Swiss-Prot record:
Entry-linked InterPro entries: Adhesin_Fg-bd_dom_2, Adhesion_dom_sf, Fibrogen-bd_dom1, Fibron_repeat-bd, LPXTG_anchor, SDR_Ig, YSIRK_signal_dom
Composition bias, Polar residues: 39-55, 75-92, 126-139
Gene: fnbA
Residue span of region 2 X approximate tandem repeats: 548-607
Official protein name in the record: Fibronectin-binding protein A
Key words of the record: Cell adhesion, Cell wall, Peptidoglycan-anchor, Repeat, Secreted, Signal, Virulence
One BP annotation, GO: cell adhesion
Gene Ontology cellular component annotations, sorted alphabetically: extracellular region
Listed Pro residues bias regions: 839-885
Localization per record: Secreted, Cell wall
């Protein structure tokens, strides 16, 4: 073979290879450019909703950090379903965007899917991750979060609920871990079923049952007994825990009210425990959420108890008991009922049986009874509402019963068991037209001869919104006389019995007419801060006003009788109406006999189961009980006073002010001014605003603004201090010394007399005052704060003369610092502070050197242009020792990305990493891909490939010429 031919073959091969290789380079560089554009695109979501995109290939470390920033803030995961088309379609409920990802789940594709998930963050919702139940293919769960974020969130629980669904619902849903955790917490926040803590309640020996007016109780005068419990609870009470106690069956807590409920125990407007009336005389109090973290809980419980007319039907002694945790508290009382009004022929008595303010209805029982066999002729009994009548109301229901029991067997308590046929016989139908009932609430009943005992049961309504209700039972008749003589017609008589209900609502003292009735359910406790410490106390005894749902009008019941139309009153009371909606009822009885005037006293006390609370609570969190802790105490005893009229319309309108002086700062105390707003139910609302304090002391007291309170701020934090309490005076921060120089902001606290001196290369005079000179050098101190007390002389000397500054103050604090952000010290003597600097130079940080020796500045190596360099924090060292700046290798920040004309640098921070962007307006996110930064290298590669191809073509062409030759 010829040499030239062999050479041509080699050139042919070389030329063809060059053309092929160059073409592949050109094509490959173009494909590489597209891959770089999609692979490195990550989105950093800022708190303001804007995003910064970084596409620089070389900045992989920063890109990873930014992705982790997103993951640590909001972590997402999705379930991907494999489809037969070998592609996974990932969508979210918020936006119908789809991203095609291969089954192999390459890292670049994971990043792409992750970006879409982050973009959908605008309206995150908790969704159920479900798995298909059809035959569309197997499923697997793909975690789309980077590994670092997954490691940081191992503790988070991914909750997935599997439910059947159709093939149309094959799209996987994205579930946010944090939202699932919140939903789980919400589901766990169920109402805790409490436990019976009755066994954890101790009844103190001071507990008792007593009557306010001695041991003789007259229920018809509105008198009642009071259960006074002094209880102590073990620690660890929880929401829902309850305790029970049982009352004897001869008393109840409601009186004539229809509602069977005891009032709640309140702390102001906060319900500490809810009261409930159970069967068989059991009372239960269930603690609410406010009992949490309360320790040393004690309760002084006072509850009004009313004599039950059904159980106690006659006069005599009664033993009233209450049993709690096996301990019985008891009291023995003499019960005495009123006899009503009577003459030698007939007796009339009556009572309000029930009163329902919600339905505006009441029931009344009246006795009509001949005395000693003395019958009467032509007797007419009428019942009517003289006040509170509803003209457009419905007809009342009136039942007439004949008493068929033993003689004198009617209950003295004026109680009618209408279902007991052995005692009462219903004769309503036998009366026929003798009984007439009107729509205005009145009735009339005629007897030709009254020779039997009758019980009249009345059920009617009264006018809604009326302020007073008075029901009158009146009997007129003539003594039985066989001969109708002149004496007979002039010897008629009239008996009148009024049951008056005075509905009143006031903001004063709800005392009954016998004086104060205080239901002080004092609730005392200490506050547990949760870390085992108990600090401070809030000591307040409150009597709280309870509001009624529809009508907060308590009731006062009066009874009036008159004979022969003559004047005069015999005053008395029979019952008190008690309702849980703060409506108490007082019952008055007034009678008069044969024109004899007089006033026999006896007024009903109106009361309500007010459940005031006495409690102690922490007002200073995590504070030790020093002189700066102020304790508050409130008064539980309401002021007295009442206004009465003959109509027994009792309206109390007063504001009694009481002050209690209790513990305080060493030489001043606080006075808690409590205004008591009460209703008849003795419920007093105390409005207490803790932030307001009042001072009072024996000596002169001045308002305290800042009590030797010093606050120093610096980069390292805040220091607070309290001086000793001496003479309390108003102090303002008037001794603040600031020293400004080229090195930054400097301040100091010094005691005694000080002088500050700064020397340069030139000799300067030195100023010294006092002894115990302490040299303090300030060299490259970024920031020092402080306050100076007493007199200070501050001088700063440079190349030019500087004036001297003098400041007045009180105490002294000095600082000795060197290359430290903040160091504090304190000295008692006089100090001299020297500060050495070098001649004026550009403001660049200096390398610390020995005190007094000027050191030339060390130039700082600038970072690459266009790349921001994060500041290097200085490391604190011991005072007075220079510390060279720590050598820290600067981290490469991300290259700023152009967004319009705004450059958004992304800086990595050691703490929770977030993208840091300059202040700017919100911009719409651009959809096109930004510049990737790899264009220059790509163009060079393409140029190289092109040249390579041209060279190959030239070789091929030359080879052809050789063949021709």
């Amino acid at each position: 073979m010829k040499n030239n031919l062999r050479y041509g073959i080699r050139k042919h091969k070389l030329g063809a290879a060059s053309v092929f290789l160059g073409t592949m380079i050109v094509i490959g560089m173009g494909q590489d450019k597209e891959a770089a554009a999609s692979e490195q695109k990550t989105t950093t979501v800022e708190e303001n909703g804007n995003s910064a995109t970084d596409n620089k290939v070389s900045e992989t470390q920063t890109t990873t950090t930014n992705v982790n920033t997103i993951d640590e803030t909001q972590s997402y995961s999705a379930t991907a379903t494999e489809q037969p088309s070998n592609a996974t379609q990932v969508t979210t409920e918020e936006a119908p965007k789809a991203v095609q990802a291969p089954q192999t789940a390459q890292p670049a594709n994971v990043e792409t899917v992750k970006e879409e998930v982050v973009k959908e963050e605008a309206n995150p919702q908790v969704k159920e991750t479900t798995q298909s139940q059809d035959n569309s293919g197997d499923q697997r769960q793909v975690d789309l979060t980077p590994k670092k974020a997954t490691q940081n969130q191992v503790a988070e629980t991914q909750v997935e609920v599997a439910q059947p669904r159709t093939a149309l619902e094959s799209k996987p849903r994205v579930t946010r871990s944090t939202d699932v955790a919140e939903a789980k917490e919400a589901s766990d926040a169920k109402v805790e079923t409490g436990t019976d803590v009755t066994s954890k309640v101790t009844v103190e020996d001071e507990s008792k049952i007593e009557a306010p007016k001695g041991n003789n109780v007259q229920p018809h005068e509105g008198q009642r007994v009071v259960l006074k419990y002094k209880l102590k609870f073990q620690d660890g009470l929880k929401t829902g825990d309850y305790f029970d106690f049982t009352l004897s069956n001869n008393v109840n807590t409601h009186g004539v009210a229809t509602t069977r409920k005891v009032p709640d125990i309140k702390n102001g407007s906060l319900v500490m425990a809810k009261g409930q009336v159970l069967d068989n005389g059991r009372i239960r109090y269930t603690f609410t959420d406010y009992i949490k973290d309360k320790v040393n809980v004690t309760a002084n419980l006072e509850i009004n108890l009313f004599i039950d007319p059904k159980t106690v039907q006659s006069n005599g002694q009664q033993t009233i008991t209450s049993k709690l945790n096996g301990k019985e508290t008891s009291g023995t009382m003499q019960i005495t009922y009123k006899d009503g009004v009577k003459n030698q022929y007939t007796n009339v008595n009556g009572s309000i049986e029930t009163f329902d303010k919600e339905k505006n209805k009441f029931t009344h029982v009246a006795y009509i009874k001949p005395i000693n066999g003395n019958n009467s002729d032509s007797v007419t009994v009428t019942g009517m509402l003289t006040q509170g009548s509803n003209e457009n109301g419905t007809q009342p229901n009136v039942k007439i019963y004949e008493y068929v029991g033993v003689e004198n067997g009617l209950p003295q308590s004026v109680y009618a068991n209408t279902v007991d046929s052995t005692q009462l016989k219903d004769v309503t139908n036998q009366m026929g037209d003798k009984l007439k009932v009107q729509n205005n609430g009145s009735y009339s009943l005629n007897f030709d001869k009254l020779d039997k005992t009758y019980v009249i049961h009345y059920t009617g309504d009264y006018l809604n919104g009326t302020s007073e209700v008075n029901f009158r039972t009146q009997l007129t008749g003539y003594p039985e006389n066989r001969y109708k003589t002149y004496y007979y017609y002039n010897n008629g008589y009239t008996l009148t019995w009024d049951n008056g209900l005075v509905l009143y609502s006031n903001k004063a003292n709800g005392d009954g007419k016998y004086g104060p009735i205080v239901d002080s359910n004092n609730f005392e406790f200490s506050e547990d801060s949760g870390n085992g410490s108990i600090s401070g106390q809030y000591d307040a005894k409150q009597i709280i006003e309870t509001e009624e749902n529809q009508d907060n009008t308590p009731l006062d019941i009066d009874y009036h009788t008159a004979i022969d139309g003559e004047g005069g009153y015999v005053d008395g009371y029979i019952e008190t109406i008690e309702e849980t909606d703060s409506s108490a009822i007082d019952i008055d009885y007034h009678t008069a006999v044969d024109s004899e005037a007089g006033h026999v006293g006896g007024y009903t006390e109106s009361s309500e189961e007010s459940n005031p609370i006495d409690f102690e609570e922490s007002t200073h969190e995590n504070s030790k009980h020093h002189a700066d802790v102020v304790e508050y105490e409130e008064d539980t005893n309401p002021g007295g006073g009442q206004v009465t009229t003959e109509s027994n319309l009792v309206e109390f309108d007063e504001e009694s002010t009481k002050g209690i002086v209790t513990g305080a700062v060493s030489d001043h105390t606080t006075v808690e001014d409590t205004k008591e707003y009460t209703t008849e139910s003795n419920l007093i609302e105390l409005v207490d605003e803790l932030p307001e304090e009042h001072g009072q002391a024996q000596g002169p007291v001045e308002e305290i603004t800042e009590n030797n309170h010093h606050i120093s701020h610096s980069g390292l934090g805040t220091e607070n201090g309290h001086g000793n309490y001496g003479v309390i005076e108003e102090i303002e921060e008037n001794s603040h010394v600031d020293i400004k120089s080229e090195l930054g902001y400097e301040g100091g606290q010094n005691s005694g007399n000080q002088s500050f001196e700064e020397d340069t290369e030139e000799d300067k005079p030195k100023y010294e005052q006092g002894g115990n000179i302490i040299d303090i050098d300030f060299d490259s101190v970024p920031q020092i704060h402080g306050f100076n007390k007493h007199n200070e002389i501050i001088e700063e000397d440079t190349n030019k003369d500087k004036p001297n500054y003098q400041f007045g103050g009180h105490n002294s604090v000095d600082f000795e610092e060197d290359t430290l952000p903040k160091v504090s010290g304190q000295n008692e003597g006089q100090q001299t502070i020297e500060e050495d600097t070098t001649p004026p130079t550009p403001p660049t940080p200096e390398v610390p050197s020995e005190p007094g020796t000027p050191t030339p500045p060390t130039p700082e190596v600038p970072s690459e242009p266009g790349k921001p360099t994060p500041p290097t924090p200085e490391v604190p060292a011991e005072p007075g020792k220079p510390v060279p700046p720590a050598k820290e290798e600067p981290k490469k920040p991300s290259k700023p990305v152009e967004q319009g004309k705004v450059v958004t640098p992304v800086i990595e921070i050691n703490e929770k990493v977030k993208a840091v962007a300059p202040t700017k307006q919100k911009q719409a996110k651009k959809s096109e891909l930004p510049e990737t930064g790899g264009e220059e290298s790509t163009n060079k590669g393409m140029l190289f490939g092109g040249l390579f191809s041209i060279l190959g073509l030239a070789l091929l062409r030359r080879n052809k010429k050789n063949h021709k030759a």
